[in-house]
From Swiss-Prot:
Subcellular location: Cytoplasm
Active site positions: 336
Family label: Belongs to the CFA/CMAS family.
Organs and tissues of expression: Highly expressed in rhizomes. Detected in roots, petioles, flower buds and leaves. Expressed between the developing stele and ground tissues near the root apical meristem, in the immature endodermis, the pericycle and the spokes of developing xylem in the apical region of the root and in the protoderm of leaf primordia in rhizomes.
Induction info: Not induced by elicitor treatment.
Protein's organism: Thalictrum flavum subsp. glaucum (Yellow meadow rue)
Record-level GO cellular component terms: cytoplasm
GO molecular function terms listed in the Swiss-Prot or TrEMBL record: (S)-coclaurine-N-methyltransferase activity
The protein's assembly and partners: Homodimer.
Pathway membership, UniProt: Alkaloid biosynthesis
Record-given protein name: (S)-coclaurine N-methyltransferase
Length: 361
């Protein structure tokens, strides 16, 4: 009940004010973390149903609805915000392999560089890659996996696919520097592209979250798999429920804090067991969210230690606007803080990484 004589600000106005303060770096990290944890708790209350019957119904209903959608939506919006950033910035924030996804920390003393390699090695092991295999890396980012596979398996042909010009140019330049003649980079949108060849192994790391119609996507990828080919997928997930990455209600400021609303799906750990029309699941693993939480923590440490180097880069890409440059720095700080809290929630036992190995039907 409102106190007489005092005007209560509308919730939307409060959230707008909060987001403005976050943009300007006016909220202490501890307070940001606390606010994020509150929203994550609300998401758990929203997603965890009171009966298992309701839980499965929610999951199955989402799989049915996705089958009615396009393969992907709002790809350009996400690309502009997340992936078209200066390579020099990524060289500062990421490890030496420029792996922009979950890394694998074997123990407390593992460095970010070691964790990058450990995860790349785990991909190769779980995908059962052998020297001489033809390998397709879909949504290759800055080429961490492409370059690692090409260097490790000298007799393999590795094809990377990206829809980013800067990523393509960087991977091609790195291939030349490393004298790798077994790398090809294609500039393409995988939702519309028709691949002329088939591959022994197809690797997809943290791309499926940005897709919608997995039935059509997997049907498309199946056509690119050799007869005995395997598809390895890494995706982030919640252990129990899946959801469109959209605000729960008008109080949910967090969902739009890092990613544009509606551009992502957060699958459940078991989500892709429901999409076996064209491929079959061979194996399935999960990794504690603590690995991705620590990855984000290491990224944030590097970012904070090099803010003075990063500022001029962002001033350049924001049209010589220092205020916009600081907003961009604060955005990336928020990205890391969000990842730390989300994947670290409940000791890494809520949101985590899932690995799925498929074979062709």
């Amino acid at each position: 009940m409102a106190v007489e004589g005092k005007q209560v600000a509308p919730k939307k106005a409060i959230i707008v004010e909060l987001l403005k303060k976050l943009e300007l770096g006016l909220v202490p990290d501890d307070e940001i973390k606390k606010l994020i944890r509150i929203q994550l708790g609300r998401r758990l209350q929203w997603g965890c149903k009171s009966t298992y019957e309701e839980q499965i119904a929610q999951l199955v209903n989402l799989t049915h609805s996705l089958r009615q959608m396009k393969i992907a939506t709002e790809v350009e919006t996400l690309d502009d915000q997340m992936y078209e950033v200066p390579i020099d910035f990524l060289k500062i924030m990421n490890g030496s392999n420029l792996k922009g996804s979950c890394c694998y920390f074997k123990n407390d003393s593992t460095t970010l560089d070691e964790a990058e390699i450990a995860m790349l090695e785990l991909y190769c092991e779980r995908a059962q890659i052998k020297d001489g295999h033809s390998v397709l890396d879909l949504g290759c980012g800055q080429g961490a996996l492409t370059l690692y596979v090409a260097q490790k398996y000298k007799n393999s042909r590795v094809t990377a696919v990206t829809n980013s010009v800067s990523q393509k140019e960087f991977i091609e330049e790195e291939s030349r520097k490393r004298n790798l003649s077994n790398v090809e980079v294609l500039l393409a949108d995988i939702t519309t592209h028709k691949m002329p060849d088939t591959y022994d192994r197809i690797l997809v790391v943290e791309l499926f979250e940005h897709m919608k119609n997995y039935e059509l996507l997997l049907r498309k990828i199946k056509e690119w798999m050799a007869k005995d080919g395997l598809l390895f997928v890494e995706h982030i997930c919640h252990k129990t429920f899946a959801y469109h990455y959209e605000p729960i209600d008008e109080d949910d400021w967090f969902t739009e804090y890092v990613f544009p609303a509606g551009t992502m799906i957060i699958p459940s750990a078991s989500f892709f067991l429901y999409f076996q029309d064209d491929v079959s699941v061979v194996n399935h693993w999960t990794l504690s969210g603590k690995h991705f939480s620590r990855t984000n923590e290491e990224w944030l440490k590097r970012l904070d230690a090099n803010v003075e180097l990063i500022k001029p880069m962002f001033v350049t890409i924001t049209g010589q606007c220092r205020q916009e440059a600081m907003k961009l720095i604060n955005y990336w700080r928020g990205f890391c803080l969000s990842g730390m809290e989300m994947f670290g929630y409940n000791n890494g036992e809520e949101w985590m990484a899932s690995h799925v190995l498929f074979k062709k039907k």
